[in-house]
Design a protein with these regions (language model features):
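Short alpha-helical transmembrane segments in multi-pass integral membrane proteins
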Residues: 1-23, 81-148, 190-246, 302-367, ...
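N-terminal transmembrane alpha-helices
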Residues: 10-47, 61-76, 80, 84, ...
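Transmembrane helical elements of multi-pass membrane transporters/channels
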Residues: 21-40, 142, 153, 176, ...
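Helix-terminus/linker motif at the lipid-water interface of multi-pass membrane proteins
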Residues: 31, 35-53, 123-130, 186-193, ...
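Membrane-helix interface/capping residues of multi-pass secondary transporters
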Residues: 41, 50-53, 90, 119, ...
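Small-residue-rich hydrophobic transmembrane alpha-helices
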Residues: 53-113, 150-169, 263, 276-340, ...
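Hydrophobic transmembrane alpha-helices of multi-pass small-molecule transporters
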Residues: 65, 180-185, 210-214, 286-289, ...
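Short runs within selected transmembrane alpha-helices of multi-pass transporters and secretion channels
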Residues: 74, 142-161, 169-177, 198-213, ...
Length: 445
């Protein structure tokens, strides 16, 4: 009954209600992800040891590789399932959902094993110094043990939205992230476990988040399935998910890899520069994460409209989403810019690290006003099943454009040039997204 009501929202609710009812829980969930990402750095910052802050800045992009792989099955599964439900193919949607679950388990176990085996090589690659090596090793060793749970939590926070259950999707993230935030000060400061405490809290939060989604399906609350008997790779189940999921995940994967590359390049200028860039990126995350949530929240609605071939409703939903996204990112960018100094000072106490953090954040905020429109367009492409266009946009912003810009500008303007590479990539990738979306729209008319 509850799922039927959710489908009614997709099909018949007023546009504003349909968009906001799906987008707001997703945005709230991403806010919790933001808080979760800030928590480790914040509470480690309270130890007044900026070397530990630098170690977390080095280790976080590596850990985010787990989340990136989870989005292969999460975003890919959401796109395929939402279109299948729009077409009335409920049994096919069940097969896709089960495929996503068991793929997360298998790939998560494999990734955990590889990370633990090659830990020292990974630390050398990310630019850990003699001062940050042990801290980064401790953190990564602990969090790497939670691979399958991280993949499941990140996958199903997306997939459940495909049947209109944005509130349930948000709740799983809320529980896991809230628990992490609660445990961080206890384990870091009260128990005195420092960076190891942060890692343990992260593991527990992901286990609880994944457990919530598993229980949701086992209780029969969903019209979808994670049962092994529904698992299949045939009928374009695997290829359908991967065709959309890999382009989306490549964007996140390249985000992690480019952050690793940024840290290794920034390490030439010292550990405080690494700490500064890590915190500066967290300042801009306050805008980007909310806009990512908005884009992910409207994707199932757009996908349903595509499956139902209701193009008038699709266009109205997209127009409202784009306007709302632009206004939202403008407000968030202004807030972050006005309070950059105060935000950075919460995480960093060293004067040099603070100066790096503020100046780097101001540069990155130059283009954060574009985030809302960019992420809505990317998700609109995914909702249309535009695998090729989605792939091009995602690998451009964090790879094809960003990485060359980082090397070129870094060679000319040193540490400041490294930071300016991201705004350059933001502008060019948005222009590319607009061109590809317009071309895709003309082809479908």
């Amino acid at each position: 009954m509850e799922n039927n009501k959710s489908m009614e929202v997709f099909a018949k609710a007023p546009i504003r209600k349909a968009v906001l009812q799906n987008a707001l829980p997703a945005m709230a969930a991403m806010l919790m992800v933001l808080i979760y990402n800030l928590a480790d750095t914040f509470f480690i910052g309270q130890t007044h040891d900026d070397l530990q802050v630098a170690a977390v800045s080095l280790a976080t992009p590596v850990f985010l590789l787990f989340m990136s792989v989870g989005t292969v099955f999460g975003i890919g599964g959401t796109s395929v399932i939402s279109r299948a439900l729009g077409e009335g193919r409920k049994n096919y949607a069940k097969k896709v959902c089960s495929f996503c679950m068991w793929s997360c388990v298998a790939v998560g176990v494999l990734m955990s094993a590889l990370f633990l085996i090659f830990m020292d090589q990974i630390l050398a690659l990310i630019g850990a110094s003699a001062e940050t090596w042990d801290y980064a090793r401790t953190y990564l060793t602990i969090v790497s043990c939670s691979g399958p749970f991280v993949l499941i939590a990140n996958c199903y926070s997306n997939v459940i939205r495909a049947e209109g259950q944005s509130g349930k999707a948000m709740m799983g993230q809320l529980l896991g992230n809230l628990l992490n935030v609660i445990l961080d000060p206890i384990m870091i400061l009260v128990f005195g476990w420092n960076i190891a405490g942060a890692a343990i809290a992260t593991v527990i939060g992901n286990v609880v988040g994944a457990g919530y989604y598993i229980i949701y399906f086992l209780k029969g609350s969903s019209s979808l399935s994670i049962s092994l008997k529904d698992f299949s790779v045939k009928e374009k189940v695997a290829s359908g998910v991967l065709a959309i999921g890999i382009p989306a995940a490549l964007g996140n994967l390249l985000m992690s890899l480019s952050s690793i590359l940024m840290n290794s390049q920034m390490a030439k200028y010292g550990d405080m520069a690494v700490a500064g860039v890590g915190v500066a990126m967290k300042v801009t995350m306050m805008t980007s994460m909310v806009c990512i949530g908005l884009g992910q929240g409207v994707q199932p609605l757009l996908g349903y409209c595509v499956g139902a071939k209701n193009w008038e409703r699709y266009r109205s939903s997209l127009k409202f989403s784009l306007i709302f996204a632009f206004l939202l990112s403008a407000v968030l960018t202004l807030i972050c810019y006005l309070f950059t100094g105060q935000i950075v000072s919460v995480f960093l106490t060293d004067a040099a690290a603070y100066d790096y953090g503020v100046s780097f954040a101001h540069i990155l905020l130059c283009t954060s006003i574009l985030f809302g429109v960019f992420y809505v367009l990317v998700n609109a492409l995914q909702a249309r099943g535009a695998a090729t266009e989605s792939l091009i946009v995602n690998i451009s912003r964090q790879g094809l454009i960003y990485i060359p810009a980082m090397f070129i500008l870094g060679a000319i303007f040193h540490e400041t040039g490294l930071i300016w590479a991201q705004p350059v990539a933001d502008v060019l990738s948005l222009l590319l997204a607009i061109v590809l979306y317009v071309r895709k729209t003309k082809k479908m008319l």
